[in-house]
A protein has these predicted regions:
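Compact alpha/beta protein-protein interaction domains typified by the UBC
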Residues: 20-88, 100
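Domain-scale recognition of soluble eukaryotic interaction modules
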Residues: 65-155
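Glycine/serine-rich phosphate-binding loop and adjoining beta1-alpha1 elements at the start
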Residues: 134, 138-304
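Beta1-alpha1 glycine-rich phosphate/pyrophosphate-binding loop at the start
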Residues: 202-206, 211-214, 329, 335-344
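Glycine-rich adenosine-cofactor-binding loop
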Residues: 297-337
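Glycine-rich phosphate-binding loop and adjoining beta1-alpha1-beta2 segment
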Residues: 335-371
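A structured beta-alpha segment of the ubiquitous adenosine-cofactor-binding alpha/beta core
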Residues: 362-398, 403-407
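ADP-ribose/adenylate-binding Rossmann-like module
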Residues: 398-429
């Protein structure tokens, strides 16, 4: 059921009691209502908007945003103007107490803005710098994030995998950046529409060298010009040596970790103006970081490859699980092509029918985990083992037998376990 007119009016009355001006409500998509108003906070007239769902019970708190402008200079205010009022609280509340929840959200937002404006007026950016990693994830840009499949701090040669969005010749280049990879070992697969572009890495010596925009400004070309004033001569030289289309990885040191921004633009050398300027946040997607977050201990610390013999319904799922663990390299062995009969049980799908199982599985795994090395052999496991000498086999961590053919699996056991040419063999399925 919808909120009564009396409760709606109580919301407006409360805003008016706080000194709110130009109060008006309007319907939003999806059954939401928003109340917009102006409020003087610490000497600044700030346009605010409170959005809530038009129901008699609320399962989530109203959202409070700065309307019609961005305030990236302020603590806890996102690039889209959203004010963080919950701080992971509010899961336990009376869903029927609409006025109480409305009042809590508005009061908390005003308190946050008051403190943030006081800090800004005093030139105090300490809170922003202390939470710079989370700050960058929420306030810098609404553009899609870039996924780093390799730790940028451990690479001297970084490349961006991009999709070229340039529509016409002789126009400023524009690219959609998808991945950031270690250039020494990774290149875009030819089957994908990616272009590899060299990345310039700029490391700031101190966190205070990161420029936070002033009030009512945002992260744009003017911000970048201010940021480059903090670069060393050597850093500026490395930046200017690159092509007209530039991709820069800005590394910001923090007490706990390094945080990163990806800046891309086309620089018109004649006018020295920036075209297609874009700033994106970086999502950590390299294996060590993800495993540390999950608390998993690696079972493959030797970094030796794992062989999967048979890439059917069982073997393909084993490959998926191993790819998401700490395995750096998989060797896939299967002589068969994908059939429609396999679709309901297989990791692959209808789009892979009539393709080699090992090739299709390799493409699917590397789409999800680009840094994973996958080597494929379209043959049966016995032929593959016969092609390997003892030294090559000793380099394998283990073989997973998922052929679904007991005579073949027994023969592998007889030849390579009983003769101790392999130390680990797993039978699945």
């Amino acid at each position: 059921m919808k909120i009564s007119d009396g409760i709606q009016q109580s919301f407006k009355n409360y805003i008016q009691s706080l000194g709110g001006k130009s109060i008006e409500s309007y319907d939003k998509k999806g059954g939401f209502i928003a109340i917009g108003f102006d409020l003087n906070i610490h000497g600044q007239t700030v346009p605010l908007s409170v959005k809530y769902i038009d129901q008699k019970r609320w399962l989530s708190l109203p959202t409070v945003s700065v309307a019609q402008c961005n305030l990236p200079a302020l603590d806890h205010v996102g690039n889209n103007g959203l004010i963080c009022v919950t701080d992971h609280q509010g899961e336990m509340f009376d869903s029927a107490d609409l006025f109480g929840l409305f009042k809590y959200a508005v009061d908390t937002a005003i308190s946050i803005l008051t403190n943030a404006l006081e800090s800004y007026s005093a030139g105090n950016r300490k809170a922003l710098y202390e939470e710079i990693d989370g700050y960058n994830q929420t306030v810098v840009s609404d553009d899609p994030i870039v996924i780093a499949t390799h730790n940028p701090n451990q690479s001297d040669s970084l490349y961006a995998w991009c999709i070229n969005l340039t529509k016409q010749r002789n126009t400023p280049q524009c690219h959609h950046i998808k991945y950031l990879v270690d250039g020494a070992s990774q290149h875009p697969p030819s089957s994908n529409p990616y272009t590899a572009i060299k990345v310039t890495k700029i490391i700031l010596p101190r966190i205070e060298n990161f420029v936070i925009p002033n009030l009512f400004t945002s992260f744009d070309e003017h911000w970048w010009e201010q940021q480059t004033l903090n670069f060393s001569t050597q850093q500026l030289d490395s930046l200017n040596k690159k092509s007209k289309f530039k991709i820069v990885l800005l590394e910001i040191p923090t007490p706990k970790m390094r945080t990163y921004l990806v800046i891309s633009y086309y620089q018109d050398m004649a006018s020295n103006k920036y075209r297609n300027f874009k700033i994106q946040t970086l999502q950590r997607g390299w294996r060590e970081y993800l495993l540390n977050r999950t608390g998993m201990e690696s079972q493959f610390s030797s970094k030796k490859p794992v062989v999967i013999a048979g890439c059917g319904s069982v073997g393909s799922r084993v490959a998926e699980i191993l790819a998401e663990s700490d395995v750096d390299k998989l060797i896939l062995v299967d002589y068969d092509d994908m059939k429609t009969d396999n679709i309901m049980r297989h990791y692959l799908g209808i789009q892979d029918v009539n393709q080699s199982k090992v090739s299709a599985l390799k493409n699917r795994l590397q789409q999800n985990i680009p840094e994973l090395e996958v080597v494929v052999y379209k043959t049966n496991i016995l032929n593959w083992l016969n092609s390997q000498n003892d030294e090559q086999l000793s380099e394998m961590h283990s073989i997973v037998l998922a052929t679904g053919h007991p005579p073949t699996e027994l023969e592998v056991c007889r030849r390579y376990i009983l003769t101790r040419r392999m130390s680990k063999l797993y039978l699945v399925g």
